[in-house]
A protein has these predicted regions:
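A short, conserved beta-strand element in the Rossmann-like catalytic core
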Residues: 38, 62, 90
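Cell-envelope/extracellular polymer assembly enzymes that use nucleotide-activated donors
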Residues: 4-6
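Short beta-strand-to-loop acidic/aromatic patch adjacent to the donor-nucleotide binding site
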Residues: 79-90
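Conserved sequence signature across two-component system core domains
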Residues: 11, 35-37, 57
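Acidic helix N-cap motif at the loop->helix transition within catalytic regions
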Residues: 16-20, 41-49, 94
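Short, well-formed alpha-helical segments that are part of the catalytic scaffolds
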Residues: 12-27
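Residue-level signature of catalytic and energy-coupling elements of molecular machines
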Residues: 18, 70, 88
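Conserved donor nucleotide-binding strand/loop of the catalytic core
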Residues: 33, 44-77
């Protein structure tokens, strides 16, 4: 049985990194959701511009709140496993 895996990408003010991060996750073949955690830069707009699957939190909830939003998304859409890769691109998704 193949598990359905979701990569949760919490992002706060990551407009310069988010496209590259999402691309690296996509290149590995994983589904993803970016959680824009109340960014004050244009992270959300960059996500929309690049047709990135994103949830926009109206205020900054911190890493815990952003990841929790991702867990809820995973449950809602029937994922078996979810993992976190930070929006700054410092986690290598090939290790998932």
């Amino acid at each position: 049985m193949n598990s359905k895996v979701l990569v949760i990408i919490p992002a706060y003010n990551e407009s310069t990194n988010i496209v590259k991060t999402v691309q690296s996750v996509s290149d590995c073949g994983y589904d993803y959701v970016v959680i824009n955690d109340g960014s004050t830069d244009n992270t959300f707009d960059v996500c929309l511009e690049h047709h990135i699957n994103v949830i926009d939190l109206p205020q900054n909830l911190g890493i815990g709140g952003a990841v929790q939003a991702g867990h809820k998304y995973a449950l809602k859409y029937g994922y078996d496993i979810d993992v976190q890769v930070d929006g700054d691109g410092k986690h290598d998704p090939t290790y998932i």
